[in-house]
Amino acid sequence: ISPDKAPASLMCVQDKIRAIRRAGADFVEVLDFDGDLRSLSAAQFITLLRDRYGVKALMMGFNHRFGSDRLPDISDYEKIGRGLGIEIFRAGELRDHTRHEPICSSSIRKALVSGDILSANDMLGYPYRLKGSVVAGKRLGRTIGFPTANIDTGDSNLLIPGSGVYAVDVILPDGKVSRGMLNIGRRPTVDHSAEAPLSVEVHVIGWNGDLYGKEIAVMFLDRIRDERCFTDLDALKKQLSADCQAAIVAC
């Protein structure tokens, strides 16, 4: 309804489609949530599903509501479904037994923003993934032996986890996977400003190819430490060596 106020996405549309197909779906269609669709009541939308797609059964999330009237209870949707010859199912609630709360996108976003990658991945059931194109940076990492690829996620609205250093697996353009250490933050050691733009940059361990202009993806495995400011580049280099070892043995 208000794209500028929508929460950040946990997965891009293309990856959602691939995931749904891997789960066994024969057909996937993304509906344009325009004014006409927004105005439909629950009954009108279920009727559309029957008439346009021949839907015989509809699965709803345990706390999901839809339609301009947002009916309050699953029984209301079941009643509409019976009148249209559609069986309505409600998915069971999944709970995070560590946090003692339902697993939902809001809980996952909260964990990612706080840097709690292990909890986020546990709730997701897979490592959180971020992808984008590699753009030119200042190339300062090369001068201390840790070249980095600066990732531009573009306008994908993908959620970027909280600032810090992370152990990641990097999916390279050729499909190969290499371990990496990734920094999210404002690079206080070299930029010296709290107003510096947020950067996402990854060092691919043991790899020296050219990635500029190519698309890569990173899968978050664990958080290594907070981002912090070092007194000089030698101190930064020493810490990066330790971070590299931590990334190698992560997970």
Annotate each PLM feature.
Residues 29, 101-104, 216:
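N-terminal alpha-helical segment
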Residues 32, 92-94, 222:
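Residues at the C-termini of beta-strands that transition into short coil/loop
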Residues 81-186:
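Glycine-rich, Lys/Arg-enriched anion-binding loops that position phosphate/diphosphate groups
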Residues 137-251:
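Phosphate/ribose-recognition catalytic cores of enzymes acting on nucleotide-derived substrates
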